[in-house]
Amino acid sequence: VIGAGAMVHPEILAHECELVSRLTGNNILERLIIDPNAGVHREEHTTRSTASGRHYSMGATGKGCSEAIVDKIKGRGAGYNTFGWIDEASEYNVHDTVEQLNGAYNCGAKLLIEGTQGTLLDINTGPYPFTTHKSTLPGAWMAECGLSPALPTDIVMVVRTYPIRVAGNSGPMPREISWPTLTREINAKRERAGLAPIVEHIAILAFEMAISEVLSAFEVPPNSDGLNQEEWWDRSKFRMALSELNAAALKYLDSSCVAELSKLFELTTVTRKLRRVARLDTNELRRAAMLCRPHRVALTFMNYEFPQYWFECDPHHSLDDRETPYIRNIERITEAPIALVSYGPGPEHIYRRA
């Protein structure tokens, strides 16, 4: 079910439906229901967003979701901005999902609602203007589906051991580190356990040398208060985000080195730039938990913190004497039990705690 508060890109939706149907052998269109009031996102919204250049100064993705929402609010295009009115709607089951979801709940069905983006990117409670275009809190997800927040809920908050942000000047990120730093730490932990490194050291060294090459091309900008280049770099007022530097440095490397680095480095979905990454910050985690009030926590990317279990965990995994204190500390901060722990991208890498 795609609810009334969702934003749908018709071309991407068609591609994903075809892909899912081909991979599963099931016709997903027979099960998919879309609310007629769901918003419509087109390529023109992306074009307008990137043309303004604001996504560079704010570190946004430039996908144009904000532009699409503005059009929906203004009613620009006389119906063009809601899914029920577009030509492609005839290919899908378009129905009032508010009635369907509430009807299913009244009949005893369990409803699973998936939220989008990070809690601390909320437009109202996040570090504005470095936020997304809407509220990302659990109550907002229910409202977008037409469900009352008074309904009984079981909120599962997803926590990354190393949080990420979109590339560019995307706002404050406490305890930010570089991917080479994280990679070296992961390799060192694995080597102490007698295991092979995740990324070859020569690739990391080449990447850091490329970063130095990029940095050497920078000059101190005017009106920088007499700072030398190192001091200027450290000032957030003039600082280019690490992800932008990393993206530029990648151009200096050959394809084999980039392929080696891609075993760990995470790219943004749309722009394919290196994401920003940071160590888990206690204050940020506490604030996110306060806003979500989770009943349970799903801890992801545990393989970054404990790389000796890189993609090797199974449902019968037993926590060792280092993992247990780490998990208990997160449970203390979030005031919620950790129910799921993932050590890799697949379901076979998920450890379910009793």
Across the structure, where does each feature detected by a protein language model lie?
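Non-transmembrane, aqueous-exposed alpha-helical and coiled segments at domain scale
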Residues: 1-354
